[in-house]
Amino acid sequence: MNHDDPNASGVPHDDANDAAPASASDAARATGHADDESSPLHLRRIRSFVTRAGRVSTGQRRAIDELGPRFVVPYDNAQPDWDTVFGRRAPRVLEIGFGMGASTAEIAAHRPGDDFIGVEVHEPGVGALLKLIGEQQLSNIRIIQHDAVEVLEHMIAPDSLDGAHIFFPDPWHKARHHKRRLIQPPFVAQLAARLKPGAYLHCATDWQNYAEQMLEVLGADPSLENTAQDYAPRPDYRPVTKFERRGLRLGHGVWDLVFRKKRAG
């Protein structure tokens, strides 16, 4: 879940039903099979969200109706021609779980030469980002309202992304829920395969335990290398959200991790 809206659904991170398959940017996809991480089905059980109800405002609904046909790319089991979708060839960045979209819009506005694919399942967030796209006249964002794991599998070609952002995914802070976190070895391997050599993966979290897990998992992937000794300074392009600023005032930490895909040789 992106910190644009720390709890847009009204459900705290771990207060959702324990049987729920996942979270707004994390977790394990239930299939009815045994929970065996060595199984080839394990990656398919990873899901990037848990279904939560959320009210779509009048303005968000209007943005969906008016701007959705241009800026929302329907999920498909085939890879679109992204150059055609954006109307140009430019560096392409994937953001998984953009929340209410404020950070996504701000980054896109400051990086007009890059194109951004935002993946979010929750309709209020989709509507909120579309509203910002309209207000700020942004042309370099497209949205897919679907599970990020399936989007990666079917809609993003290997070695095609110049960057990926995963900001403040749900931490699932209870130990019994850690298996639901998004940043797990199978998912990271899948995402890394979609990055071009030299492309970056930027994760951020305000949960130290999750930051430690991210550092371990990302560091163990043989195709990735850390750009820092451990945690990275916050890159200038990532905005500090109101929620994050409040946490920092209260003494809470925020950890950024920036890895790059290794080049051949």
UniProtKB/Swiss-Prot annotation:
Does Iron show up as a keyword for this record? no
Q: According to its record, what are the GO cellular component terms?
A: tRNA methyltransferase complex
Locate the residues binding substrate.
174, 206, 241-244
The segments labelled Disordered in the record are 1-40
Q: What is its EC number?
A: 2.1.1.33
Quote the record's binding site residues for S-adenosyl-L-methionine.
95, 120, 147, 170
Which keywords has UniProt assigned to this entry? Methyltransferase, S-adenosyl-L-methionine, Transferase, tRNA processing
Q: In Gene Ontology terms, what is one molecular function of this protein?
A: tRNA (guanine(46)-N7)-methyltransferase activity
Q: Where is the composition biased (Low complexity)?
A: 18-31
* Stored InterPro entries: SAM-dependent_MTases_sf, tRNA_(Gua-N-7)_MeTrfase_Trmb, tRNA_methyltr_TrmB_bact
- What pathway does the UniProt record associate with this protein? tRNA modification; N(7)-methylguanine-tRNA biosynthesis
What reaction does this enzyme carry out catalytically?
Answer: guanosine(46) in tRNA + S-adenosyl-L-methionine = N(7)-methylguanosine(46) in tRNA + S-adenosyl-L-homocysteine
Annotated active site residues, numbered on this chain, are 170
Please list the residue ranges that the record marks as compositionally biased, kind Basic and acidic residues: 1-16
Q: Does the keyword Ion transport apply?
A: no
The record's SUPFAM superfamilies line, in alphabetical order, gives: S-adenosyl-L-methionine-dependent methyltransferases (SSF53335)
UniProt cross-references to Gene3D superfamilies, sorted A to Z: Vaccinia Virus protein VP39
Q: Family per UniProt? A: Belongs to the class I-like SAM-binding methyltransferase superfamily. TrmB family.
Q: What does this protein do?
A: Catalyzes the formation of N(7)-methylguanine at position 46 (m7G46) in tRNA.
Q: Which NCBIfam families match?
A: tRNA (guanosine(46)-N7)-methyltransferase TrmB
Official protein name in the record: tRNA (guanine-N(7)-)-methyltransferase
Annotated organism of origin: Burkholderia thailandensis (strain ATCC 700388 / DSM 13276 / CCUG 48851 / CIP 106301 / E264)
Q: Which gene encodes it?
A: trmB
